[in-house]
């Protein structure tokens, strides 16, 4: 029986790994200007400096796109797509939670294309990779950094819909537990439970494979062993 597993091309991990990893990626991709996708909550918490400081040290130009609300609509994504198209950036970096990463993933297949988000809702296979992307998640549980789908709201139908296209899988992912040190324990716990829901879903899926089950079981053990009272300890947060 044939099994398939789709994951990001390159994964960097480790506490404090953002600075060295992002410089390595920029040099590898020969990027001249980075388009940084984030939100006002991240900026207000002072977390974005973990990314901006190494960009400044490296002398890399960047532009910040932070006008993103939770669960953005397809219109919100089109707005930020137009803003990105007016920029000369050549690498996308998503620094945030699921909504930020989903928007960035969509722009990575929209920028400079002749199709819209509504076109992708009708026919996701239209999407083609337009820009390389880097995902730096700031919460434990969305999993958007590792998937080929993105969720957008469709206000006129009062629903949320998913767009699935393998071209949206980030080219690079940086997992740095230092990012979640400033998060309230309640947020870490809530997103940790979200992560647990994902591994349970993975294990019980009709499309589960021996390889995906291995990851799901390992993930469940890490979460169960670290999410309770010790969630405030940095070592436990890193495992979650």
PLM regions and their residue ranges:
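N-terminal small/polar loop signature for handling phosphorylated ligands or for N-terminal nucleophile
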Residues: 43-115, 229, 233-235
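Catalytic cores of large soluble enzymes that bind and process phosphate-bearing ligands
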Residues: 10-14, 43, 69-72, 184, ...
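An N-terminal, well-structured beta->alpha segment
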Residues: 1-64
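Conserved beta-strand elements of the Class I
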Residues: 35-36, 91-93, 134
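A glycine/threonine-rich phosphate-anchoring loop and its flanking beta-alpha core
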Residues: 112-210, 219
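Local beta-strand N-terminus motif with an aromatic residue
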Residues: 31-33, 89, 170
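Active-site segments that bind and position negatively charged phosphate/pyrophosphate groups
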Residues: 202-237
């Amino acid at each position: 029986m044939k099994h398939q597993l789709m994951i990001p091309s390159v994964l960097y991990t480790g506490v404090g790994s953002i600075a060295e990893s992002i410089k390595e990626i920029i040099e590898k991709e020969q990027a001249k200007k980075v388009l940084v996708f984030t939100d006002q909550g991240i900026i207000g918490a002072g977390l974005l400096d973990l990314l901006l400081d190494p960009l400044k040290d490296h002398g890399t130009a960047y532009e910040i796109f932070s006008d993103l609300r939770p669960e953005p609509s397809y219109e919100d994504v089109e707005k930020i797509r137009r803003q990105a198209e007016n920029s000369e950036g050549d690498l996308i970096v998503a620094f945030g939670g699921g909504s930020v990463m989903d928007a960035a993933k969509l722009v990575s297949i929209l920028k400079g294309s002749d199709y819209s988000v509504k076109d992708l809702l009708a026919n996701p296979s239209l999407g083609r990779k337009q820009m390389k992307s880097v995902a730096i998640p700031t919460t434990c549980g969305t999993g958007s950094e590792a998937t080929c789908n993105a969720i957008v709201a469709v206000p006129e139908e009062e629903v949320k819909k998913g767009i699935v296209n393998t071209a949206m899988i980030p080219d690079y992912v940086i997992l740095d537990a230092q990012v979640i040190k400033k998060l309230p324990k309640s947020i870490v716990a809530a997103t940790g439970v979200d992560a647990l829901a994902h591994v349970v879903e993975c294990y019980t899926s009709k499309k589960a494979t021996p390889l995906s089950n291995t990851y799901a079981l390992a993930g469940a053990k890490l979460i169960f062993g670290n999410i309770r009272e010790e969630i405030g300890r940095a070592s436990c947060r890193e495992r979650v």
